[in-house]
């Protein structure tokens, strides 16, 4: 077995993050692909985890413009992002509310630029004055980085990473620095889009491409913005069944909702497992996690997960995937998976 590769992980908490699902998702993917499309990007766990060597073309997409901007800044300006976070210390609810006002276009930190430059002129000695003014002007010329830092703080310090209520969580700076550095490295060469997921599928899907979709779970992620209603799930289903995507390797993650099962079961294999549900009040409550594929996953379920060789993801006591249903509406494609 080769050298253990330390994978990149999401560098911020995220509602519905899929880090715990990665062993199951990777088990269903080919070893390599010409294209990787993560069309409902969220925390980007799949794109980050597979890394630069997985596909010549990798696309991360999310409909949330602030989230897409955060990924662009992490890819292109990680040091500027870190510096901007130093400008935005967040210690109390009032600080958090200022960040939300900025994100909601009710406050612009550059409104006080002239005043800050004047203060620097009056109170700093000449040598320090020029450095301070240069720093202030340089920061004002990076509105995308300012917004990315504010968005990160709104997630990191909010209750349950919802981005809308102060939770007062502490930050381990050393751990964050490591996460951001590895994420920035993994994002090099990634195309970051801010589009509707179906538009990305139509634009980038090709024969052999891997498409991973993790849409907001129906009636389970009400905190997600923008909303994703049942008709949006129908659009996604129809898009993935259209000719443009039919010859791609498609994997979706979903919750076990009757409307979702009725929608996808005729055209997709459904595999899943149960896990403890810490959010439920009932003791020993279980949560049903589903993965859906447009190919027969049977040959993959017994495949040893050596893609990552990472003991942090592969656990001997994790539940095994089970095939729950096979499509009835058409003859599904059975992929000839490469072993190397």
Predicted regions and their residues:
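Conserved proline-anchored active-site loop of SAM-dependent methyltransferases
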Residues: 25, 36-50, 60-64, 152-159, ...
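Short active-site oxyanion
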Residues: 32-36, 55-57, 187-191, 244-250
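Mobile active-site "lid"/loop adjacent to the S-adenosyl-L-methionine
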Residues: 165-169, 216-235
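General small-molecule cofactor/ligand-binding pocket signal
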Residues: 191-193, 271
């Amino acid at each position: 077995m080769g050298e253990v590769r330390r994978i990149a992980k999401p560098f911020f908490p995220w509602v519905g993050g899929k880090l715990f699902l990665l062993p199951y998702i990777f088990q269903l993917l080919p070893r390599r692909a010409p294209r990787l499309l993560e069309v409902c990007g969220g925390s980007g766990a799949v794109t980050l985890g597979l890394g630069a060597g997985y596909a010549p073309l990798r696309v991360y997409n999310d409909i949330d413009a602030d989230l897409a901007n955060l990924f662009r800044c992490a890819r292109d300006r990680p040091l500027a992002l870190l510096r901007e976070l130093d400008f935005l210390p967040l210690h109390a609810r009032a600080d958090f509310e200022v960040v939300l006002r900025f994100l909601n276009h009710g406050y612009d930190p550059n409104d006080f630029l002239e005043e800050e430059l004047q203060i620097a002129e009056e109170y700093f000695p000449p040598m320090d004055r020029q450095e301070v003014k240069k720093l202030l002007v340089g920061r004002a010329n990076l509105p995308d980085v300012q917004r990315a830092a504010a968005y990160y703080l709104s997630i990191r310090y909010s209750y349950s990473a919802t981005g809308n209520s102060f939770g007062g969580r502490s930050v381990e700076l050393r751990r964050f620095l490591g996460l951001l550095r590895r994420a920035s490295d993994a994002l090099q060469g990634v195309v970051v889009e801010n589009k509707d997921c179906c538009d990305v599928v139509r634009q980038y899907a090709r024969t052999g491409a891997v498409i991973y979709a993790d849409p907001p779970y129906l009636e389970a992620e009400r905190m997600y913005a923008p909303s994703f209603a049942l008709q949006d799930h129908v659009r996604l289903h129809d898009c993935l069944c259209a000719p443009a995507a039919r010859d791609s390797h498609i994997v979706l993650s979903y919750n076990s909702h009757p409307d979702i099962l009725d929608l996808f079961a005729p055209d997709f294999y459904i595999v899943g497992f149960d896990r403890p549900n810490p959010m439920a009040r009932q003791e020993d409550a279980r949560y049903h996690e589903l993965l859906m594929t447009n190919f027969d996953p049977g040959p993959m379920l017994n495949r040893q997960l050596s893609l990552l060789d990472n003991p942090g993801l592969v656990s001997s006591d994790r539940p095994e995937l089970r095939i729950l249903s096979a499509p009835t509406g058409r003859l599904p494609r059975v992929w000839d998976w490469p072993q190397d």
